[in-house]
Amino acid sequence: MTRRNFTLFSLASLALAGTSGFMLGKVEPKVHLRPPGAVENFESLCIKCGQCVQVCPYHSIELLGFDDGVNLGTAYINASKRGCYLCDLFPCVLACPSGALSHNTSEIKDVYMGVAVVKNLEQCLAFKTQSVETSHIQHLLARKSYNEREQEVKDILSANLGKTCALCVNSCPVNGALVFERKEQRQIVLVKDECVGCGVCEEVCFARVIEVVPHAKHRQKFKTKEKNE
């Protein structure tokens, strides 16, 4: 999206949000993955300026469209397309003028976006001891790299070719958030308490085994499992 088109979209979003409230209000809001530092009342504080979109070096942040009702024009992350790589200094946070992204967010430990959940372990290539093939990640490698950071993402993906799949663990920007545990000659990916819900694992998992649940906490999703262990 060009800067001109981006500006026009932002203005249109503001206009529609103000004049079509009666129509948008009938749409049930969805729960979306928000950028790092998003406060509890993010939807009411986000002014739809798009500054976070403009400064994100990974092009992870987008603005919600017309189908999203009252959330139209607010910033979100579609982890299945591009997760958040938790940049140094969090440029999206620094660019936010309204406080929708808390400026107290300066380190990864300050981030809480959600939590990753393994949905279908039987389809996991690591669990099946299958190797990564070019066809598996071609859609990711085909993305244009606009800077060194995006190229580094591709380099990590390429380094996994021909090896037993470990894309989620190797790509995760948070040390220790995803780990493998070996049980009965199989690799099982575990989501640990360090997970902040950045969504990178969902992006790189071509088997669609992992997804991020926005706003959820590790203890909520894994409490039952931990009790049984």
Please identify what each model-predicted range represents:
Residues M1-E229:
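Non-ligating segments of multi-cofactor redox enzymes
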